[in-house]
Amino acid sequence: VKILPPALPALFLAAALPSLGLAAERPEGIAAAEAIAKAALGADCDMNGMEEVPMVGPEAEGFGHALYRFTYKPDYDPNGPGVEATLYQLFCGSGAYNIRNAFVLQTSDADTPKLIAFATPDLAYAYANEENSRLTAEPKINGFRATTLLVNASFNEKTRTITSHAAWRGIGDAWDSGDWVFRNGNFMLTRFEFDPTYGDPDPAVPESYVVYEAGK
């Protein structure tokens, strides 16, 4: 079986940024979060060379940092006071159609913020033709690896879920998507789905493969 990790061909292509419009003031702690991400990721988190990345909202399509605050009860002290958490979603850079994001978490029970590492399946699959439009068999999971960069990520404050959706090329026919839910101070992988096939939809080929779903 040929092992082909999901490729993100446009992640490192230079791209012009859209107009950011009015940006929020940079909050306390954002500079420290940036420093952690840059130190760990180097050129993969060059933030498109911007000296100061603005704080932006959904209207800016992710070309900036975002901040979320919430409180949770840790397992080690469920009856005690809640732990305050600040989640920094950092714009690390962009390509032609993908945005790279890193996430840094600061909690009131920890002295320093931490760069979040996300569990991701290591996939094994093989194409059945030169067009890469179908597989020889259903994909398998070799195991799991950790990544500190997600693509086109978003955070759902209600469910406390980070979701990523990476397009493997511009038209988006091949892609991968993951969900990570916040539980007891960490983000846990709960679902991973991908479509490694290219070209027009084929009724004989599955639309996508859910290769991991927690509890199943």
Where are the predicted features?
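Positively charged n-region of N-terminal signal peptides that target proteins for export
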Residues: 1-6
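Bacterial N-terminal signal peptides
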Residues: 7-18
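Terminal domain-start segments
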Residues: 21-83
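Acidic/hydrophobic-patterned starts of short beta strands in beta-sheet-rich repeat architectures
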Residues: 80-91, 100-103, 157-165
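Short, flexible beta-strand-to-coil junctions
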Residues: 90-97, 108-109, 165-172
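Structural motif
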Residues: 96-104, 172-179
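Surface-exposed loop/turn elements that mediate protein-protein interactions on large endomembrane-trafficking
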Residues: 109-116
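Short aromatic loop motif centered on NTY/YTY
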Residues: 116-184, 188-216
